[in-house]
């Protein structure tokens, strides 16, 4: 009987830890934010959205910018959208150039919802592989 209660407690502990475990996509988005805007990490929150189609949402909840996405790439798109249209800034390809944003982050009025229009998309022009990318280091790729 005692052994059964120990096993029950162990299973309950493991289940509660599993529920508290951070989603991998959320962790990846947070790592991106930490690289780009380390002093603003507490001002943002990322949430995993359900669904297969790529999408992101952006909203202000209390004093935080909440970005949702169905995967890490969608969350990164949401962060880029917020930086571009609310902070009026861009993220340079050059890893040594800091992202400049207002000291006080602009709040999002109405919730932003964006969904991919097509299933398959591509990134970059194939010619760029011969112009700059062969000389990139990991910090450029990671950015």
What residue spans do the PLM features occupy?
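Feature activates predominantly on carbohydrate-active enzymes
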Residues: 31, 38, 51, 61-143
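Bacterial N-terminal signal peptides that target proteins for export
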Residues: 1-8
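Hydrophobic h-region of N-terminal signal peptides that target proteins for export
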Residues: 11-20
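Cleaved targeting-peptide boundary
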Residues: 22-27
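Low-complexity, Ser/Thr/Pro/Gly-enriched N-terminal "stalk/linker" regions
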Residues: 32, 36-37, 43-45
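Long, folded non-catalytic interaction modules
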Residues: 43-49, 55-58, 68-69
């Amino acid at each position: 009987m005692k052994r059964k209660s120990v096993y029950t407690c162990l299973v309950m502990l493991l289940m509660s830890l599993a529920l508290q475990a951070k989603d991998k996509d959320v962790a990846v988005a947070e790592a991106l934010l930490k690289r780009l805007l380390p002093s603003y990490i507490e001002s943002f929150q990322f949430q995993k959205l359900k669904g297969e189609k790529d999408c992101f949402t952006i909203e202000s909840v209390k004093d935080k910018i909440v970005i949702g996405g169905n995967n890490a790439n969608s969350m990164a798109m949401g962060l880029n959208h917020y930086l571009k249209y609310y902070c009026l800034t861009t993220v340079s390809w050059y890893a040594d150039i800091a992202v400049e944003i207002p000291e006080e982050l602009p709040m999002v009025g109405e919730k932003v919802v964006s969904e991919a229009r097509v299933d398959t998309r591509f990134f970059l022009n194939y010619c760029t592989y011969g112009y700059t990318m062969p000389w990139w280091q990991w910090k450029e790729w990671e950015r």
